[in-house]
């Protein structure tokens, strides 16, 4: 079976856990306990407010994007706890629960023109949220992604790297990232390593450009 791969393989080593090898200690981050309920306490840099985009952070890697030309786009929306079986495994192991972000109101969600996903990992794609988002927005997803949606009238556009789609007056381009994908692993029976593509997104509107890298390591693709 064909699987996807990074454009530039190179050396990559991903941490096994985030207990002690994920992030170095920093005076800018305070946690109640090891990696629990962490808050950024450092100085925020000055942000150029004339970017042409209005970006609202919804927690972790989820963003609500309003473009200069008036389109509303959700990026990697994950509103609640992670999908089964990850949420179940956390409870079974007495692990942590996700700090759920502030909810986006129904009226605001109803204005969404498109939803884009960078890859299929549980912290970026939550099946439980699809029913809430509904069939009104168009879904732009990496190759191999559509089969994870319910068969209920969703408008889904699977995209390869360096392909583009217009949503209203906003041009959206799918670009490479240096990462991997998987969602299901049953020892000796089934695995879906790199069965779906991954990447980042470039948004162009009214002469302005915004880049969402997705999950990525450094490589010449930048």
Predicted segments — roles?
Residues 82, 120-125, 146-149, 163-166, ...:
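Active-site environment of divalent metal-dependent phosphoester hydrolases
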Residues 59-60, 141-148, 160-162:
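Short, polar loop motifs at secondary-structure junctions
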Residues 85-141, 147, 155:
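Active-site metal-binding motif and surrounding structural segment of the metallo-beta-lactamase
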Residues 65, 161-169, 203:
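Short acidic-hydrophobic surface loop/beta-edge motif
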Residues 51-52, 61, 135, 161, ...:
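Residue-level marker for the onset of beta-strands and adjacent loop->beta junctions
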Residues 128, 181-222:
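Active-site-proximal loop/helix segments of hydrolase catalytic cores
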Residues 152-159, 171:
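Active-site regions of enzymes building and remodeling cell-envelope glycoconjugates
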Residues 1-114, 173-180, 193, 203-214:
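Metallo-beta-lactamase
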